Amino acid sequence: MTKVGLSLKRILKFGVYYGVADKLPYSVTAGFGPTAKRVRRWAAKDLFEHAGQRINVEKGAWFGSGRGVSIGDRSGLGLDCLVMGPLTLGRDVMVGPRCMFISQAHNTGDVSLPMTDQGMAEDRPIVVEDDVWFGAAVIVLPGVRVGHGSVIGAGSIITKDVPPFACVAGSPARVVKYRGSEGTPSVS
């Protein structure tokens, strides 16, 4: 059976994560926060397809069964983050609070049928390369690849691929500068 297959261990970890661990205090909360972080990591890591070293899964993060979700070393899911469908986070990825990664969509092409009867489209996985920072409340849509070293401004909606080292912002997001470049507007 694969790691993401059904097993007693997975069922128990699922129950512990969604029944207890995801409700524990934010990891930087004085006192119990660091312990809560370790409990969430312990409960969540076996649910993911891959979990690297020192991952962080914050309070309220929702990732379904974890099927198709891979998190690289020193990366994590922020406070109240939502993952719907396959997602790969590289190494050293910071995800701010309330970000959404949505790799699922509904079929809408048949105008003779109500959209509720058209079912789901095939998942289009989201890939986030290494060393990326997502500000708060970013939405990433199906099939997007976010390039190495990028910075995504708070509240941005990512509808297409982001080049390496780009700083993007807006709805839909657009490149406002590249990291390391001088004399260009900064993301605020």
Model regions: which residues?
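Flexible, glycine/small-residue-enriched loop-and-beta-strand segment within the central core
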Residues: 34, 38-41, 61-71, 76-144, ...
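Short helix N-cap motif at coil->helix boundaries in the Bergerat
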Residues: 160, 177
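Acidic, glycine-centered active-site loop in nucleotide-sugar glycosyltransferases
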Residues: 164, 169-172
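A generic "structured core" feature
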Residues: 90, 133, 151-153, 157
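A transmembrane-helix-recognition feature enriched in membrane-embedded lipid enzymes
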Residues: 2-55
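Conserved catalytic segment of ABC-fold P-loop ATPases
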Residues: 147-150, 163-165
